[in-house]
Structures are given as C-alpha cells and as structure tokens.
Amino acid sequence: MERAMEQLNRLTRSLRRARTVELPEDNETAVYTLMPMVMADQHRSVSELLSNSKFDVNYAFGRVKRSLLHIAANCGSVECLVLLLKKGANPNYQDISGCTPLHLAARNGQKKCMSKLLEYSADVNICNNEGLTAIHWLAVNGRTELLHDLVQHVTDVDVEDAMGQTALHVACQNGHKTTVQCLLDSGADINRPNVAGATPLYFACSHGQRDTAQILLLRGAKYLPDKNGVTPLDLCVQGGYGQTCEVLIQYHPRLFQTIVQMTQNEDLRENMLRQVLQHLSQQSESQYLKILTGLAEVATTNGHKLLSLSSSYEAQMKSLLRIVRIFCHVFRIGPSSPSNGMDMGYNGNKTPRSQVFKPLELLWHSLDEWLVLIATELMKNKEDSADITSILLKQKGQDQEASCISAFEPPGPGSYERLSTGPGESKPDVLAGKQEASADCQDVISVTANRLSAVIQAFYMCCSCQMPPGMTSPRFIEFVCKHDEVLKCFVNRNPKIIFDHFHFLLECPELMSRFMHIIKAQPFKDRCEWFYEHLHSGQPDSDMVHRPVSENDILLVHRDSIFRSSCEIVSKANCAKLKQGIAVRFHGEEGMGQGVVREWFDILSNEIVNPDYALFTQSADGTTFQPNSNSYVNPDHLNYFRFAGQILGLALNHRQLVNIYFTRSFYKHILGIPVNYQDVASIDPEYAKNLQWILDNDISDLGLELTFSVETDVFGAMEEVPLKPGGGSILVTQNNKAEYVQLVTELRMTRAIQPQINAFLQGFHMFIPPSLIQLFDEYELELLLSGMPEIDVNDWIKNTEYTSGYEREDPVIQWFWEVVEDMTQEERVLLLQFVTGSSRVPHGGFANIMGGSGLQNFTIAAVPYTPNLLPTSSTCINMLKLPEYPSKEILKDRLLVALHCGSYGYTMA
C-alpha cells in the first residue's frame, strides 16, 4: 500500500511539472535529460533530480566529451553551475579540445560563471590543445571587464599558445584597445616575439589596427621584423592600411622614404600601394608634394636603368610603368585641403604642384636624346643608301636609269659581285662600311625600341595626368610629331610595340591617324586582345557575366514583352554595373546564369529586326538589315534605336554573339567610315549599277542634264532635295561626277537615316568607346558581333561557275579549292567577304547567293598572270578575278595576302 502511494505521488509530481521526477540510472540517458534544464538554468529541477540520484556530475558526453559544468559555463547558467560545483563537478576537466569550463566562460564573456569557477579553484593557466588559456580567449574577444578580475589569478600574463603568441599578441591583432592597455598595465612584455619572431606591433600592423599600434608605439614598442625579415610596415602596405602606416611614420619618420621605395617591389599589389600613398598624400599639402617628388625621383632612376641596355628589360619596364601609374594616381587625388596649389615643401621652400615633375625632366631629356640620335642615324643611312645607288649606277654606266631607282632603296642581292675590279677595287670596302653602319643602326633599333617605347608610355602618362579628362597634352603631341619617323620605324620593325606601349593612340585621335595603317595591318586576333584589354581596364571583375550581389542589379524582364520590358529596364540601369556584369531573370522563372544571358541576347537580336517595330528593313540579298528610313511611323523609334545600340554594345562588351547581320554600310556608320556607291547595292542594286555606269563611262556628250539634286517622296509629295548648297543649279559633268555619286550615296545611305544612326550610336557608345571600335573594319566588326558562320566547302564548289577561260578541271582551279579546303574557318569567311561582300551564306546554301540583279552564283574568272599580281573581286556580281598562277604555292601566297591585307581596288603588292 505504501509503495503504491509513493508511485502515485511521483506520478502526480511528474504530471504537475510536466517532466520526469527521477533520473534514469544510465548516465548517458540521464545526462540528456538534465542538459536542457542546465541550459535553461532550471536549478531547482536539476537539484531535485540529482538529490535522489547516483548520477556522475563529471560524466563526459557527446562528440567533444564535455560535462554538464561545461554546458552551464558556456550558456551562463550560473545557478546550475554553482549547484554542479557543490555536487563535486571538476572545474578543471578538459574536453576533447582541451577546453575547461573556464575557457568557455571566458570565450563567451560569462562574468558570474568565471567568478564562481575561480572560487572553486579553476586553474587559469591551463592551456587547451592550441595552447590557449582563458586569458587568450578574453583577449581575442576584448573582454576587458573580465580581464581585470582574471589577471589577478594569472601567474604569467605572457603565457604562450602553441605558436608562441601571448594574450597581448591576439588583443593587438583584433584591435581591442582597452584590453591591450590592461595587459600592458599588468606587465605584459610589449616586445615579446612569437615562434616566428613576430611582436605585438607586428600583429597590430598585420590587420591594420591603427589604435593598438599607436598604443604600443606610445609605450615604447620596438620596430622589429620577424625571422623572415618582414617588417610591420611591409604588412601595413600589403594590406593597404594607410592609417596604420601614418602612425608608424609618426614614430619612425625614416619609414616614409621606405614606402616610396616600395613602389619598385613587384611582389606588392599595386592597388594596396595606391591606397596607402593616397591616404598619406591627403593628410597635408607638404606630405602630398613630398610623396610625389619621391615617386618622381624613383621613377627617374628606374627609367634610366631601363635605358641602360645591361638591365633586364622586362623587370625594369614593369617597375617604371608601375611607379608612374602610382605617381599619376596620387597626383590626381591630391590632399583633402589643398592650399591653392602651393604649400611648404619638405625642403622648406614654396613648391608649386607642377614642380613635382621636375625630377622626371632628366628622364624625358634622355629619351629625347636617344630618339634624336636614332633619327640622325636613320637619315645618315638613307644618305648612304643614296651614295651606294649612285656608285652602282656609275659602275654600270646606267646613269640614264637613275630616275627609276628609289633614292632610299639599298642595293639588291648580288650588287657587289657585279662591281668591276681594278681602279674601283676599293669601292666594295666603302660600300661594305656603309652597309655595316646601316646594320648597326638596325641593331640599335632592335635592342632599344622596346625600352624607349616603354619610357614614351611613361612620358604620356605623366603628360596626361596634368590635363583635364579627354584632352591630349600639347607637349606630348609635339613630341610624337617631332619623332614621328623614328616611332614609325619602331612599330614597323616590331608591331607588337603598339599593343605593349602605344596605348596613347587609343586616347588621342589626332595621333591615331598617323599609325592607323600600321595598326590595321596587324593580325585581327592581336587587335581583338588589345580591344578587350582596354575595354575592360579598370573593371574589378574578370568574370564578365556573373550574378550581382544585389537583387536590384538583376534585369527582370517579361518573356511575352521582352523587347519593351528590356528597353525600359536597360534605360534605367547603371551603365557601369552593366559593363561589369549582367544577370537576367525572366519574370516567373527561377533560372539565372550565363545560359539565360545568352538566351536574352539571342531573343533580343531577333526582336530588334522584328518588322512590328519598323526599325530595320531587309536588304536586297535578304540576309542583312539596314535602318529603316521610315521608322518614324513608330513614335518611340529613336528610343528603340538607342536601345538597339545599347544591346549591341553590351553584347560586344561581354563577348556575347548576336543572331543578326547588318548591311556593310551600317557597320561603316558604327565605325565612322564613309560609305561609297557600292554600299547602295544593299538597298537598291539597280540604282547602284546606274551609279557604277556613270563612273565607268564618259558622260560629257550624253545630255543627261543631271544636277546636284534629286527628287524624293516626302509624305506623298515629290520634292527636290539639293545634294549640296545650290545643287539644283550645278550640272553634273565628267569632272565632277565622282563627287555627285558620293553625295547621292551619302543622301541615300546616311542623310536619310541620320537620326536613327545617331540614336543607335548614342546607345552603342555607352559601352564601346569610338576610339576602340575604330581598330576594326566593317568585315571584322561583323565577326566580332555575330561570330564566324560555318561554310560548307562542298556546297561552295558545287555552286561555283567559271568564266574567261577557266574550267572546273583546270590545275589553277584545283589548286584554288585545295587551298580553300586547307584554310581556317576565319580565312574562308574572309574569302567569302572578299568576293561577295558578305560573310554569310544565305538560307539554302550557295545556290541562293544574290548579286546585283538577283541570284548570282559565285564565279571565278581567269586573269593573265604577271608577277606579284593579287586576286581582285567584283562584289556586285560575286566574281573572283583569279590570275593564272604558275604554282599552288604562289596562288596560296597571293590569295592570303589579298584576304589579310584587303586588296579592294588594288591589284599589286
């Protein structure tokens, strides 16, 4: 009966308290019953359960083998913690990581738990498996209020962890000022090194902790490197911690010059150096001038080393340009509170800002001397070549042919062997001396061109940073004009110099024109790399299509109204962010990523030429599109043209191909290349043939009575539109017919769609600068935007006709097709463009190629062979005029020269 009553009482208590009132006998089961109560600090319940139990309060459980005392200390359950201690819990028991309850209380800032643990003899000097004591944990988290209590129980405030780090090390690293002061007040060793030789100051600088570094220096901390020679300043600069560098310089002024010299260290990231020097320069005008003067001196020293042929070109070139870039960056930033461009310089004199460039004048003077010397030698060699030519002519008795020989052309092979002996025996020695001098000059150019070009690049950067944005320095323009011949000699000898050092051409249209013919002669691939290198310069993200961090940067478009919704969103988007990356999501769909971006561009490229928007019309060949002169029927047509330009610019910026091809004339408009009468064929082939007829025939006695005006339909009424002022009264004659053809071409191809072109270019240039896109011609621009189409050579052969004496079985024709089969896909496209004016095969293959009067098969016509003759073409009739070359090798060489050099209208090379 008594036992039954006891069970009933236990049942009642359990139901009232909604828990068990007895612990299981098994420790593993019991501990998981107690743990939630300990975490909630339900000390009465824990006490009741423990009172009638044999539970081991030091029982370790779980993966990390902690006791309930660890749990209480970790959670701040002070009442349960005291209860467990009274029940005999061990305050110094270590879990699997070596942590005691005191470690956990210190880490989490449980002050009351720490106090009780210390009362029950918790050992503050116990280290965990990493060598950390409780004092380390307090230092890591900046628990200064607890540290005061704990240090009274610590026997050694400089106790080290496994890496030899004291609490002061970690407090300095984490920037806890009051903790650092407390440790120092408690006797911590301010210069104590860890196993790597790193002091607390080293640790403070490694994380840019300005305030803790200042406390240490104020209290006499020594400036010491670690065992590898890395100094606190090195760490500050590596991290870009300008404020901490400033503190170091305040206590150790000699470090200022060290920072300037660090610009030569290629292992240091340039952007970190910029951050440091930018911060220092903004503190005062005097410091700003001091930094710039120091950088100018270092740049001058490095520049002269670069001009020394015994130095390493690659290393010195990179060093010079790096220093100059930093110099220009700091110069543009300037101090926060400039003193009207003047302040006391570090030498005690009033120093205008322009004076910081003075040390560099020595380098520019050396550069000028080098270029003048080379120019002199080049001129001397030209004179020597003229002397050699004169000698040869006299020896051969051919003075009457002198007018046929170039004054600057050196003698050809075998010239010296044909010289007579006897009285003129010494002549070859004279000529040999002159040839050796010429060879020496060329050798000098070979070894100096890259070095001098790198210094020229540095000179341009320094000139530019003194000019307003968008303006070219008159001094630099004068410099290039003065040394024009030598610079062209450099790039002719080594065209790669353009891409390596002549970046100024992209920013100076007035100079670009001088070198454009050389640039255009460079391989398409090299120009593409140069294009994208400068297009993306300054952009932080190398992965061009990525998911932006912010949801606001995602272009959310509606699939059922993709053109209009995309137009609205792109017009409002931040252009700078769009240049860095694009993320697109279709409304109601989860998909994102590069595949969605590609789909977006593909759909939009089709929508741009959708007839519903009336923006573009199909050309005569049915494969390309031209701006619609009647697009005004759509009230928003100019906004849409601007959007079309943005889409093509974005696609080019992000290397995304568009599924659309335009007429050759429209690509010319994008490039700023004037159109010609042949471009008219894309919209009116018959009219183009008429213009061709006028040019090909004498119109003097035909009585055409044409004037410099045309009749055009303006809203249903015929009006006379002058091609130039007073054109209605100016007759077209044999002498001015070329001007007439050009003006009427411009009317049809440009003036009629000028507003549309302007709107398109406004959008396109938001992402693609005009100076960059001019690196290409209209054929190359098409490849950049739309990619390279596949060409079926068998279909090409099947649908080719032969004329003027050629037949399919002729050796020249067989050689031709063998060469075509061996061509790369790019070269085949160039051949197709060369002959037809288009890089695409129309739907249905070569059988559907259009000419000026309708369907016109690809045709190969025979031309009599003369040495060096190049193939030519007539694009209006898709005809390749192929000379009857004597061998396959010559045919291949001449054909590739024509394709890569663009022999449109030229027949010799």
Curated annotation (Swiss-Prot):
Residues 409-428 are annotated as: Disordered. Its main location: Golgi. SMART domains: ANK (SM00248), HECTc (SM00119). It holds the Pfam family Ank_2. Autoubiquitinated. ANK repeats lie at residues 23-55, 64-93, 97-126, 130-159, 163-192, 196-226, 228-253. Keywords: ANK repeat, Cell cycle, Cytoplasm, Endoplasmic reticulum, Golgi apparatus, Membrane, Repeat, Transcription, Transcription regulation, Transferase, Ubl conjugation, Ubl conjugation pathway. InterPro entries: Ankyrin_rpt, Ankyrin_rpt-contain_sf, E3_ubiq-protein_ligase, HECT_dom, Hect_E3_ubiquitin_ligase. Homodimer. The homodimer is autoinhibited and stabilized by its N-terminal helix. Interacts with RAB1 (RAB1A, RAB1B or RAB1C), RAB4 (RAB4A or RAB4B) and RAB11 (RAB11A or RAB11B); in a GTP-dependent manner. Interacts with the 26S proteasomal complex through the 20S core proteasomal subunit. Interacts with RARB. This is E3 ubiquitin-protein ligase HACE1. It comes from Rattus norvegicus (Rat).
